[in-house]
């Protein structure tokens, strides 16, 4: 195998596929390179995730063939090469990257050790989605996933497709994030769970282009995601997602507020800065909200925050404690310029409502 490719395109391709290694376990670090008359394909496959990307422009395939090598090492070597075109060639058990006045050598691995790119099994539910919207929906809920691996359901994002509606949900026991969008009628009714770690690895592959589309396919145990140049095969999380709907109160809120998002984010940013490292028991430090005609925000920590915010307030006075760290993540993902919050009492959840998004935050106990 011998190819000539621009360094920029090579590094970009390797950064795309490196996410397919080590998600949810210790996978062997293998990169498979396949060159033929249609271009060059780079592929990594792990236990839970496989990624492949194809480069068809600004390259020359001088000798078709295929080989495998260490992906991380290949990316390191490519990054060290001078700008411009790079020749990649295999000779016996060595893989050379060459440019003017520079040649670096890596090792070739055994192709038999490369796991196959797994196809879907069972009935396939296939739909096309706007790339920008799909990426933004995942981004807006991903922060609410549980970070550990011991609870696969809670560390996953739940996808629900109901004909012309797509909804994604994530929760971690302290917060819930829900994002919903209307799409063209699909005739599809399906749901699945995908680990947050998998979504984090593939999120950079989804174009941030409102004019482009992605194909999302749900199978029995796996999903596929396809763009113009990339293809992802990932494992679905088994089991059932939590019945999160029952966490939403079925009564009217004690008080509703509407406040400017930018102003509230600035205040909560200062409260998050004030957080002290937990001394024992990981007891969260609350930001105290005194809600009456205005909102008084108080936080004691590295610094003391004491601010009064103008807001539209409807309901009874309320004093409640909220984690500023959790609130900061919710405010960042909230898609509108004005935030509407519903409070159901000092010991009940707080619901952030919007046209296409909904977030829930559990309060922190405070002294009266």
List PLM regions with ranges.
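Structural preference for solvent-exposed beta-strand-turn elements
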Residues: 1-368
